[in-house]
Curated annotation (Swiss-Prot):
Biological role: Component of the cytochrome c oxidase, the last enzyme in the mitochondrial electron transport chain which drives oxidative phosphorylation. The respiratory chain contains 3 multisubunit complexes succinate dehydrogenase (complex II, CII), ubiquinol-cytochrome c oxidoreductase (cytochrome b-c1 complex, complex III, CIII) and cytochrome c oxidase (complex IV, CIV), that cooperate to transfer electrons derived from NADH and succinate to molecular oxygen, creating an electrochemical gradient over the inner membrane that drives transmembrane transport and the ATP synthase.
Name the record gives this protein: Cytochrome c oxidase subunit 2
Similarity annotation: Belongs to the cytochrome c oxidase subunit 2 family.
Residues binding Cu cation A2: 221, 223, 225, 229
PTM: The signal sequence of COX2 is processed by IMP1.
Residues holding Mg(2+): 223
Oligomer and partners: Component of the cytochrome c oxidase (complex IV, CIV), a multisubunit enzyme composed of a catalytic core of 3 subunits and several supernumerary subunits. The complex exists as a monomer or a dimer and forms supercomplexes (SCs) in the inner mitochondrial membrane with ubiquinol-cytochrome c oxidoreductase (cytochrome b-c1 complex, complex III, CIII).
Entry keywords, A to Z: Copper, Electron transport, Magnesium, Membrane, Metal-binding, Mitochondrion, Mitochondrion inner membrane, Respiratory chain, Signal, Translocase, Transmembrane, Transmembrane helix, Transport
Cofactor, how bound (note): Binds a dinuclear copper A center per subunit.
Annotated positions binding Cu cation A1: 186, 221, 225, 232
Compartment annotation: Mitochondrion inner membrane
Top EC class of this enzyme: translocase
Signal peptide boundaries: 1-15
Length: 251
């Protein structure tokens, strides 16, 4: 029942999961994703203005010259208009590029992480290691995460998204994800957290996240990696620090 209510909250109150025919962003839970959404919205506004301007020009020119089919035959060259349609798009691209570069730099920057989680992609599941924590037997806390088969799904669980084991993390904590793969190229992607990083064999890629609210966040492998590519979901549970420590003691 609690699982059902939690998923209902995520789907209705917080849009943290994919929905049928959803062509929009999921609600952000990290500063990185908030920056991505803000950049997208700002760019879309100016693109709509440009679209309206270009459409108006095309309509005006078409209407004007359709009334006088002779005029365009004597217009062979227009240096002014050529300069305008060369410089104006270049300026627009520069305006878009600068905030994009700033956001890209901030997303790649790993700021004094309080903990590190290693995510290893394999065909076709994920393996996680909490490198900073050791259990009672002196081993690193680690586990594997598999998709729950359709015939074993419980009420409120999501097809091809829920897993048998979740990655539990504390909120308001700088977390570094170190991502790699053991066989082929995978991709570690969680839309609500603004995370998307390649998992490449023999290479360690890293990305940071500061989750600002509790909740359950879903992701998937976003790189075609074989026949069961769709069966590599990612499930992140963000909880309070006391709840995280309690979970950690149980491992």
């Amino acid at each position: 029942m609690l699982t059902f209510l939690s998923n209902l909250n995520n789907m209705i109150i917080m849009n943290d999961v994919p929905t049928p025919y959803g062509v929009y962003f999921q609600d952000s839970a990290t500063p990185n994703q908030e920056g991505i959404l803000e950049l997208h919205d700002n760019i879309m506004f100016y693109l709509l203005v440009i679209l309206g301007l270009v459409s108006w020009l095309l309509f005006t020119i078409t209407r004007t010259y359709s009334k006088n089919p002779i005029a365009y035959k004597y217009i062979k060259h227009g240096q002014t208009i050529e300069i305008i349609w060369t410089i104006f798009p270049a300026v627009v691209l520069l305006i878009i590029a600068f905030p994009s570069f700033i956001l890209l730099y901030l997303c790649d920057e790993v700021i004094s992480p309080a903990m590190t989680i290693k995510a290893i992609g394999l065909q076709w599941y994920w393996k996680y290691e909490y490198s900073d924590f050791i259990n009672e037997s002196g081993e690193t806390v680690e586990f594997e995460s598999y998709v729950i088969p359709e015939d074993l799904l419980e009420d409120g669980q999501l097809r091809l998204l829920d897993t048998d084991t979740s990655v539990v993390v504390p909120v308001d904590t700088h977390i570094r994800f170190v991502v790699t793969a053991a066989d082929v190229i995978h991709d570690f992607a969680i839309p609500s957290l603004g995370i998307k990083v390649d998992a490449t064999p023999g290479r360690l890629n890293q990305v940071s996240a500061l989750i600002q609210r509790e909740g359950v966040f879903y992701g998937q492998c976003s790189e075609l990696c074989g026949t069961a590519h769709s069966a590599m979901p990612i499930k992140i549970e963000a909880v309070s620090l006391p709840s995280f420590l309690e979970w950690l003691n149980e491992q």
